[in-house]
C-alpha cells in the first residue's frame, strides 16, 4: 500500500464498516488495534504506523470463532470476514474525532418535533493532532426542504495542540 506523499502532513485513518466477529489490524507488522463486534464500524488512527518512503503492509485478521462476542448464539451460522467497505482517509491535523465509535464524528438528533416547532441537536468532537494551538470556525447550516437556508450558526473556537474539543449546539425553529 503506497501512500501519497502529500499525506505526510495529515492524519491517516483506517475505517472498517464491518468485519465479523473480531478484527485485529496490523500495519507494517505492528499491531494497531482490535475491534470486537461484527455489526459495527471501527476507525483507527494509523498515522504513527505509516511509511511514506516505502510501500506499507496492511493486514486485517478476522476471527468468527469467538463465542464471547454478541450475538452469542442463533439458529444460523455466523460467517466471518470483512463484509462491508474498508476506507483509508487522510484529513487535516484539525478534524472531527473519527475514532468515536466508527462514526464521522458528528451526531445529529431531533429531540423535539411537532407541527409548530422542531429542535435540532448537533454534537461532536474536534481533535487537534497538531502540536500547536489552532483557531477554527465551527459552522452549521440547516436547509429547508426547497434547498434554501433556514438557519446558520457560527462559533469561533481555539483548541490546544493534542486536545479534543467537544461541542453541542441546540437550535429551535
Show where each model-derived region lies:
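Accessory beta-strand-rich segments of carbohydrate-active enzymes
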Residues: 1-99, 103-105, 129, 139, ...
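Ser/Thr- and Asn-enriched, surface-exposed coil loops between beta-strands
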Residues: 8, 38, 114-118, 161
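Beta-strand-rich binding/interaction modules
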Residues: 25-27, 116-158, 165-169
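Charge-dense, low-complexity intrinsically disordered segments
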Residues: 73, 159-161
Amino acid at each position: 500500500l503506497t501512500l501519497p506523499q502529500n499525506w505526510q502532513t495529515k492524519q491517516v485513518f483506517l475505517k472498517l464498516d464491518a468485519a465479523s466477529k473480531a478484527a485485529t489490524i496490523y500495519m507494517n507488522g505492528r499491531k494497531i488495534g482490535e475491534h470486537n463486534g461484527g455489526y459495527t464500524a471501527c476507525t483507527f488512527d494509523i498515522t504513527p504506523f505509516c511509511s511514506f518512503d516505502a510501500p506499507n503492509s496492511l493486514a486485517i485478521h478476522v476471527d468468527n470463532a469467538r463465542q464471547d462476542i454478541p450475538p452469542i448464539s442463533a439458529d444460523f451460522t455466523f460467517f466471518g470476514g470483512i463484509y462491508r467497505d474498508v476506507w483509508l482517509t487522510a484529513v487535516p491535523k484539525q478534524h472531527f474525532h473519527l475514532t468515536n465509535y466508527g462514526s464521522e464524528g458528528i451526531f445529529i438528533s431531533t429531540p423535539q418535533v411537532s407541527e409548530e416547532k422542531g429542535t435540532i441537536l448537533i454534537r461532536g468532537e474536534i481533535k487537534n493532532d497538531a502540536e500547536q494551538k489552532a483557531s477554527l470556525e465551527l459552522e452549521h447550516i440547516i436547509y429547508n426542504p426547497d434547498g434554501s437556508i433556514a438557519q446558520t450558526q457560527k462559533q469561533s473556537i481555539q483548541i490546544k495542540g493534542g486536545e479534543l474539543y467537544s461541542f453541542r449546539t441546540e437550535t429551535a425553529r
